[in-house]
């Protein structure tokens, strides 16, 4: 949920310094400081609770204290995604007043780009998942080693599958923090206090069937560093985000809850796609391998 705000610059600097001093001890993936409380990890664990993930595999996907996990990778310094707007559902900002910095169609294009990237990553996860179990139902490479790099390049098929799942989940979780989807209505909206849509559940628009139009009134904040210069006169990320419990926008708990619901929905959608593509028998075995810490012992 967290972007490169001044606090994140401190975190990034600490991470780089830590890497230089002790490469084995990079420990900032799920931050529990500077107002942050491992939101992506907590959302993922809540959303996937009861889905059958082994403890070690869930640690890889969600992260744990001292690691980013697959879901936290877009916020990791050096991964190259911190300032990629669609990886965090940013820059879909618009306000109904003359001369606003971008048009409604431009804002909607940014929102569509975020959704498109989510499903591109889910499609990549679906493709890599096929390497875990062969058509004859024998196992492929099901290992993860001691850890997964989640660097966009290296890793076993299971690591790459988890990585792409994590990238998709990160964007969908950020959507609820960075947009006005769950926000309470504002009686007199302004650029600094934009309207809320007051939804209580996941956005159908982020589901597997793309509706024809972006939901009316949906926006996300303009992100840039520094925002006062990059987003002058616009609905800023700073105005809309619910990244931390102390945000002035309010709605943190609701955003966390709905993001967890969407996380489970995305896993269920992905599971259905695995079965549809690879058949029930092979597909169920693939899903078992993804979830299991010891797949060759537990997946038959």
Regions found by a protein language model. Name each.
Residues 167, 171, 175:
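Catalytic glutamate of the conserved HExxH
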Residues 22-23:
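N-terminal signal peptide c-region/cleavage motif recognized by signal peptidases
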Residues 18-19:
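Classical secretory targeting signals
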Residues 26-166, 178-300:
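N-terminal, motif-rich segments that launch catalysis or mediate targeting to/interaction with membranes
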Residues 1-12:
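Bacterial N-terminal signal peptides that target proteins for export
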């Amino acid at each position: 949920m967290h972007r490169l705000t001044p606090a994140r610059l401190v975190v990034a600097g600490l991470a780089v310094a830590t890497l230089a001093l002790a490469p084995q001890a990079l420990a900032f993936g799920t931050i529990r400081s500077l107002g942050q409380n491992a939101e992506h990890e907590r959302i993922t664990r809540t959303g996937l609770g009861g889905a059958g993930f082994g403890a070690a595999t869930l640690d890889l996907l969600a992260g744990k204290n001292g690691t980013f996990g697959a879901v936290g990778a877009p916020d990791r310094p050096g991964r190259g995604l911190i300032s990629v707007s669609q990886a965090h559902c940013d820059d879909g900002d618009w306000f109904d007043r003359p001369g606003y910095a971008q048009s409604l169609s431009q804002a909607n294009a940014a929102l569509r780009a975020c959704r498109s990237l989510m499903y591109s990553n889910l499609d990549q996860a679906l493709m890599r998942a096929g390497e875990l179990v062969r058509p004859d139902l024998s196992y492929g490479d099901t290992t993860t080693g001691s850890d997964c790099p989640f660097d966009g390049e290296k890793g076993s098929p299971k690591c790459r599958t988890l990585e792409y799942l994590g990238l998709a989940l990160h964007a969908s979780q950020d959507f609820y923090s960075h947009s006005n989807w769950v926000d309470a209505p504002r009686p007199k909206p302004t650029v600094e206090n934009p309207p809320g849509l007051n939804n209580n559940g996941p956005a159908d628009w982020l589901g597997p069937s793309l509706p024809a139009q972006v939901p009316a009134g949906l926006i996300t904040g303009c992100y840039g560093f520094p925002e006062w210069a990059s987003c002058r006169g616009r609905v800023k990320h700073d105005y809309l985000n619910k990244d931390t419990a102390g945000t002035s926008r309010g709605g943190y708990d609701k955003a966390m809850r709905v993001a967890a619901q969407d996380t489970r929905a995305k896993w269920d959608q992905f599971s259905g796609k695995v079965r549809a593509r690879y058949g029930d028998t092979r597909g169920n075995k693939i899903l078992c391998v993804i979830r299991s810490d010891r797949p060759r012992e537990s997946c038959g």
